[in-house]
Amino acid sequence: MHLEAVSTRANVTALKNPNWNQNLFLMLLFGLTATRAWAAVPSANSVKLVTQHGYLPDLPVLVRVEVLTPQGTRDWSLWDGEAVLSVDSGAVTLSTNRIPMRNGMGSTLVSFSGGGDLNLTATVGALHATRPLASLAGSPITTVGGTSAVDAIWSGVVRVTNDFTIPAAFTLTIQPNTLVLLDGVNSGTAGVDINVNGRIDVQGTESDPVTFTCSSTNSNVRWGQLRHSSASLATAPVSTYRWAAITRAGRAPGEGHTGQAPVVRSSAARVRFEHCSITDHGVTTPGAAGFGTPGKIGYATGSDLSFDDCLFQRARMGPEVDGTALLFTNGVIMDMRGPDDGDGMYIHAQSAGQTCALKLSVIAAGDDDGLDTLDPVVTVEDCILRDWASVVEDAKAISVFNGVTTVRRCLIVDSTVGISAKTSGSNTTVRVNIHESTITRNRTNVLAQFKSNATGPRIDYRITNSILWGVADSVASDFGETNFTIGFCNISEPWPGTGNIVSDPMFVSAANHDFRLLAFSPSIDSGNPQSTADADGSPIDQGWITFLPGPSALSHPQQMPDGSHRFDLSGYTNRQYVIEYSTNALDWLYLFTSFQTNDPSLMVDPEARNSPMRLYRARLAP
């Protein structure tokens, strides 16, 4: 007779409880104990609430809410949600108490009337987070403007009454918990600007962020822009914005795509944004006065930009970059609205030696293209692109116009067209590489599109290890099938190519936007066998997310006459499992790795001889 135990973190803890002494004794007595596969008992998700530490009555404040997994990443499985705001002061009234959320992220502008210190709480389902906000009414205000002839340091409440310029070789430092109020106008292009010809260092923190916003409580009044420029990119200093909210700008001259004003204008400059929110620079309600004006997120020429953990929301369009290196990681772009060109991002050709990449990000909900391109070489990895569904604007999640775009491990859904590619003439080409991605629930998943003077053979799609599912015409061309080379894909229509299948991919719940694969989906292990294997040693799957089987189980323990131990491992086939052992249920050591070819498989531990107690557990590699 042998005792079986489940080795979870909770039960290992229980073994140290005095009430379990008898069971521990039985383990010692009987020796071999088989265990199920273990997994750390996860903590619950959590809510992160980011907003400025102090506020002025009736002046809108950006409130950003995120739902985080126990690993600290945004919970993308929270496809659509809502955060509810509340305060603990009966003397304070909120302009709104609801924040729509997508994939674990949402924000809105909230004004607090009545005054007084308060605690602001954001609740998402059963989760909540609270932050104190102190009233800044009556606080001293520093007034600035003009050109600074020295390094400048801002703190507290700062009001910029006319254009402020920091010259070359000088630095503007903005300390944590600074509220920067810029004077604005209700029409035209004469809002107050900050011109950075030298360097800016915004030193916000999560608990004490920096805010740039308009000094007026009138929502139609907006300031101008943040303008970065230098003599050359090679000698440009690096400007940094950390934990900054930049809201209610755009009264500046229009430039580039859409002709609207860029809130961040960069020319031959190096600018880094970390944990920033650039929001509320345009009218995004259809039919409202000024719809689609006056601001877009940014416009850069000849520059080097990076954005990490940044939110762009509620503007005419996201950033437009030309001849510029761009890295956008762990970010969210939402709600780019307006008549024509309400794009999430627009990337032109970069300069020699520069790269453009978007990674680990969500690009959701706009009136035109999630990502629009003109001639660049760009990589999109580990992203969700969703809800670019306007029929009027011929919307696409990704629009590729010349150049090379590579899409890897992405989910592209609920758009008019998933990916469209076109060229401008007989002397231009376009290449689209799609690997390990899921493109589904779009009117058309991939399209080779006609453009004036274009010829079909110059559009070249290479698609592997992907799922293109959900519409009768999943792969469409204005020219012919020769635009597409497709292999080892699951497509909702027959298509020539090695390894292609037409079979329901068995999503967990497409209706609820859960596009993971169910066990025994035909897309599991069905990718190109020459591709790099998945981390657990199995052949690569088709689609954007690797299938993870359920817990394995160890059973039927036996102690053989020679003292060795045997037991069965039951787990998903074609996967590597790591077996570990312990003599005290607390300290675990590696024993061996086994490739599961049959279910169950016999495991043998020849080193177990003369062990007073031996516990085992198994997990999926690596």
Sequence positions of predicted segments:
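Extracellular beta-helix/beta-solenoid repeat scaffolds
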Residues: 155-224
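Short, composition-biased motifs enriched in small/polar/acidic residues
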Residues: 549-622
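C-terminal accessory segments
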Residues: 498-546
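Core sequence-specific DNA-binding domains of diverse transcription factors
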Residues: 40-138
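Predominantly extracellular beta-rich ligand-binding scaffolds that present long acidic/polar faces
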Residues: 141, 382-387, 397-514
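Residue-level detector of buried hydrophobic side-chain packing
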Residues: 174, 212, 244, 489, ...
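Short glycine/acidic-rich loop motifs that flank beta-strands on beta-rich extracellular proteins
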Residues: 161-165, 183-191, 215-217, 221-224, ...
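Surface-exposed loop/turn motifs in large extracellular/passenger domains
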Residues: 167-173, 197-209, 228-243, 263-275, ...
